[in-house]
Amino acid sequence: MLTWLEQFLIRYPELALFLVIAAGYWIGSFKIGAFSLGPVTGALFAGLVVGDFAHVPVSSMTKSFLFLLFLFGVGYSVGPQFVQAMKRDGLKPVLLAVVVCLTGLAAAIAVGRILGLDPGFAAGLMSGSLSQSAAMGTATDAVNGLAVPEAQRALYISHIAVADAVCYIFGYAGVIMWCTVVAPALLKIDLRDEALKLERSLGMSRAKPGLASAWRKFELRAYRLDEHSPLIGSTVAAAEARPEHRLFIHRIRRGERVLQAEPGTILAPGDVITISAPRQIIVELIGSRAEEVEDRELLDIPLISADVFLINAKLAGMNLQEASQQDWTHGLYLRSLSRGGQELPIAPGVVLQRGDLLRIVGPEPVVENAAKNIGVIVAPSNSIDFVVLGLAIFFGGVVGVLVSFPVGSIKIALSTSVGTLLAGLLVGHLRTLDPRFGRIPDGAISLMTSLGLAAFVGLTGIHAGPIFLSALRDSGISLLLGGMVVTLLPQIVGFCFGHFVLRMNPILLLGGLTGA
């Protein structure tokens, strides 16, 4: 049975890859406390097992194809925020990332030389220790460019996967331990308390409803005002001027007439008003203190929901509190806000950026007018602009091959990997200028990034499987100890630089360390 399975996997390597992907995601789903390998590292270990069991042939073109899809997807997803983040946040996060990355690179080079590691082991040491499995792809590109015999290159590429597998577990767990236990102890802070402080600085509230809840699901109801109502004698604008809640008066029935609620209209006893607000706000502010009226004509206000792509440069840079004070937001509700496929919390201090996707709700004329002030309405679509996708990767790869810079006596090219990543950044950024350009749905981007990297790493594991155990016996302990140094040194240096030099907020500092 095992012999048949071995021959089957060798004969049908594409099926072996799908087996590795499935096993990788299954392995990555297991958790020990807060620790889990994740699907990418799970795919690496699954690939090593399958590769050790059966010498499955691996196509280098397939590996490159998958890795380039992953890189383009990453660039595309962060492109809309990349330039804006540079403008908004300044150099602090960038400088922190540069220091951490350069320290990690220098540590990997130094440890590699001290231990006498070959290029493959050294590259895997870096990718595993820094828990950056994507570096396996660029390292493979670099190894393929070495002027050594083909057999030697194949051995080096196998060593990348071996070293990554050995170093990854501490590379992942070590950063978690540093950022959740050691660093907070050194800073003498409680992570939860600091996170709550940061939330409050952004206007978020967990204890009571505020802007976050008032800009979500809402009701449209009609109420008759009696002579004891606190709203009697006040204008519509004054009744709506509640900074802690978002409430709007749309129409007023006065006798037989239906009036549009103008800001200067004074409310009188007997008026029936239509109010839109979140359900809990209506209950808290009005509740049983007013008579609810079922007035079909008054309540017949067409409401629509629209996804609007933010391209207005004047709006970008405002926080939600400032944006909500614009004249054209009257009667408008923000149901959700997403950036790069990730939904953001709705709070007064959250700053808008070009490329954000806002789902707004309100009366049809209000939504249409707001969309003009925000950007353009994006119609739901599952179509992919394959023309832009293919040409961007092609020309990005061409630029990566042709552009080089001197380092000492040699020239180093950007490589197809870096070129493709830059192409993704460019296309993603251009979409902030015209969202109709290069459209790729979030689901497709997620597939490119998650499946692309997991499949690439799985193939690398399959390739390294036949020599994994022997390489582990020869270099396992030295790789593990060296990996610990490469994991912790960048964290320590980055922590000191961010805290003492940049004086960053503790939560942002620790977040930057995990991201860098």
Curated annotation (Swiss-Prot):
- This chain's source organism reads Bradyrhizobium diazoefficiens (strain JCM 10833 / BCRC 13528 / IAM 13628 / NBRC 14792 / USDA 110)
Q: Which GO terms describe its cellular component?
A: plasma membrane
Keyword annotations for this protein? Answer: Cell membrane, Membrane, Repeat, Transmembrane, Transmembrane helix, Transport
The UniProt transmembrane annotation reads 10-27, 32-54, 64-83, 95-117, 165-187, 386-408, 412-430, 443-465, 480-502
Query: Cross-referenced Gene3D superfamilies, in alphabetical order?
Result: Regulator of K+ conductance, C-terminal domain (3.30.70.1450)
Q: What is this protein called?
A: Uncharacterized transporter bll3475
- Its domain of life? Bacteria
In the UniProt record, does the keyword Repeat occur?
yes
